[in-house]
């Protein structure tokens, strides 16, 4: 697999999702990543540390330049816990849990987050403002309500299917209520 192509596709998709979601500085962005799927394999079966590092480092650079915080979801072997910066865990009141990811428990994305973040910790649960799912890892449990599907500019990174989620406030009040316009809500 061509690493330059994977990096280019990752950059294109992330920048497109950020444009479509209009995330603000300080927002939480969750990443689900199967390096196995990126390489054309079955999720969890052919994990690649190199691919995890390439993708996470690329995304951290893009998000960091915008002041957006990355949370990297692990697999079910770590109960889908997430790696974030300690400062983010403290700022958002997230519960820190004790686990250190491995290639086959947590995955390559989490290992990469531990490598590239300043002070990484694992947290049990978050409510991110938006997220990117590379390889059908199921990030929905970590994106706040109401979740809105985003169609990225590319449908795949490498061989992995790509989807994204944004969120918007719940609409309450009924027939007489009026709602502000936003870029996420479909009218």
Swiss-Prot record:
NCBIfam families on file: TIGR01440 family protein
Disulphide connectivity of cysteines: none
Protein name: UPF0340 protein SPJ_0612
Record family assignment: Belongs to the UPF0340 family.
InterPro entries in UniProt: Antibiotic_NAT-like (IPR028345), DUF436 (IPR006340)
HAMAP family listed in its UniProt record: UPF0340
């Amino acid at each position: 697999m061509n690493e330059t192509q994977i990096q280019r596709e990752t950059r294109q998709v992330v920048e497109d999702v950020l444009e479509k979601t209009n995330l603000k500085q300080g927002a939480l962005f969750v990443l689900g990543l199967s390096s196995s799927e990126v390489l054309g394999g079955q999720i969890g079966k052919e994990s690649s540390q190199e691919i995890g590092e390439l993708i996470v480092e690329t995304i951290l650079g893009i998000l960091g330049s915008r002041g957006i915080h990355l949370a990297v979801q692990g697999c079910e072997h770590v109960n889908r816990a997430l790696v974030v910066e300690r400062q983010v865990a403290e700022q958002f009141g997230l519960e820190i849990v004790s686990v250190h990811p491995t290639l086959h428990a947590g995955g390559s994305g989490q290992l990469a987050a531990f490598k590239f973040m300043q002070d990484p910790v694992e947290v049990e649960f978050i409510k991110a403002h938006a997220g990117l799912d590379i390889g059908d890892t199921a990030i929905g449990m970590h994106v706040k309500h109401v979740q809105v599907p985003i169609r990225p500019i590319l449908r795949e990174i490498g061989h992995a299917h790509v989807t994204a989620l944004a969120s918007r406030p719940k609409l309450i009040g009924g027939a007489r209520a009026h709602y502000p316009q936003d870029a996420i809500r479909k009218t």
